[in-house]
Amino acid sequence: MKNTIRLLGSTAALLCSMLVHAQNDEDLVTYNGEAGRVINENCVVCHREGGIGPMQFETYDQVRPWAPLIQIMVTNREMPPYAYDHGIGIQNLQGDWRLEQEQIDTIVAWVNQGAPLGNPDNFLPPPQLNDPSEWNFVDELGEPNLVIPSIPIDIPANGNDLWSTHYVPSGVTQNRCIRAIQVKPKGEAKSVVHHANSSIEIYDEEGQLGRYGMLTEYAMGKWGELVPKDVCRTFPQNSVVRWGIHMYPGGLGTTAPGTIIKDNVVEIGLWLHPKGYEKEVAYTQDLKQYSIQFQRSERETKLVIPPNGYQMTQGFHSFDHPVRIDSFQPHGHLRMVAASLEIFSPKTGRTEAISQISNWSATWHHSHIYEPDIAPLVPTGAVLVLKQWYDNTAANPNNPDPDQWVFGGNRTADEMTHAWLAITHLDEAGYQKQLKKRKEQEFLSLSGTASP
């Protein structure tokens, strides 16, 4: 009888152990399961052979040693490198790299369980990626219709900041509307080109070149720009592109080569709408630099950050007609740590938060592109409020020397305070039409009726 009881007890214990083990297997997060999919879909695009990431994450053996660091970086939302605050302002963005909380929880659970591989026979298929030198929009738009290169520039292995200003023909023989645009430093130039601005100049009746407007802006880490389908961002015929390129010898970031780069070329890739597209849309978009507190001419004397101190700037802009804000890209250098965009209504006295970036970094300049159906509509007379914050203390990990006075200027060691905004210019009828459309969509959404 005692032996029978012992046998039954042993069997029960074994069954309990098997049930617990089965439950644990069901709860186990593995690389060959969800964890690897999160990494492949969000990390490998940079962390691969030839990519800009400092280590490769293409296989389990490559990922496993870095698992604890991956957990820290995704938990702190430092990776993927897309600093944009959750829960403040507009959250629907095109090209949003932020992980969903469920994806972060998956990585955390995987690492806490020892970062297991999982069933080796059920291996994760390798990610299908384009060549790192390929254009970013090639999958959805194909190859660009037009590529405009800068002149070749030699960049030394070390030394002071360098600038190049030069002109190249656009190659555009008929007015065209821009669909998308990307600036791409070639090869190792990615880590030494701080920014590359390009503007459009056209000839007047006397044959003299004059400024038409911005073509695009590039700063380190920027992915590109998408233009809404309902507007025309014009590239005029027979124009000239004025390049303004700022280079930092030796480079910034973990993949900086620290060697001389021969014949560095920066390229602009342009995806264009078909000829005559401007006749199909009613409004135009432009990209401009909006100063914050100080105009460029006074920045070098009035923008001052003391040693081991802080600074904050604030700028205000309004329009004599309604507009739509299509994208927001703050700009600064090594001491800048945060930025925001708000809209103040003089009629109501209320301020609406649009975008907040509380962990901004000079190595990743993102153009935050709002989804067209929720991009901020700004009535005539409303005020855009732009703010930026600076930290010149040792607490700022990007700060090379907190004991230095920092002034406004063009060098990497100096500071800037402005934002790039892509604006669609409306008239009152267009503004009211878009407001009405959004109210109708909101009603359909609340009523559970699908939008046509």
Task: List where the protein language model places each region.
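Short, charged low-complexity linker/loop segments at the C-terminal edge of domains
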Residues: 115-119, 276-280, 425-437
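Bacterial N-terminal signal peptides that target proteins for export
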Residues: 1-9
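Aromatic- and Gly/Pro-enriched helix-to-coil junctions and flexible linker segments
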Residues: 22-168, 187, 194, 238-244
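Extended, polar beta-sheet/loop recognition surfaces of beta-rich domains
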Residues: 65-78, 259, 398-403, 427, ...
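His-enriched metal-coordination microenvironments in redox/metal-binding proteins
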Residues: 133-419, 426-429, 442-446, 450-452
